């Protein structure tokens, strides 16, 4: 009996020692890499992106941006939207079978003669007087994206490097504009609103007979 007790104690100590060594085994580099791989695999493949939301009385136009094709135009539009620049402006020019145009701050007033003559870039891009924001314009970023229905493009004067804040949305395909105006986005939701706006009764200057105001904001969506 005396011999059995020491033997049992020895077995117990051996088992405790083995159990302890298993708990304290270090994590190998391979295991760490596997953990990192698992975490990366669980990350969403499509992180949230910024889209434009143009709100009208007919509903929302949701716009995705082509940042790689026209980075300056996208940046300027987003800055204007975030600063509330577009809020209260209207779609001041509508041509059925062609496009709807907006983004002119002059349209916050009632003087239709000034519609289509206002606006500027949201920051200085090297053109205009740096100390006079009203002179800031965007350099052309013409690209290979075709002017199809739903395309968001920048309006300008006869000078290619004269984009400001005014934009237009194609109500129909307009391939004759390709390479002449900078495409920087497209409507991905709410296309029926384009039709509702473009078919409004209008005057001889293509101004809608009633005001369709907009509010523009930037949101993050999947």
Tell where the protein language model's regions lie, with residue ranges.
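Small side chains
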Residues: 10-12, 52
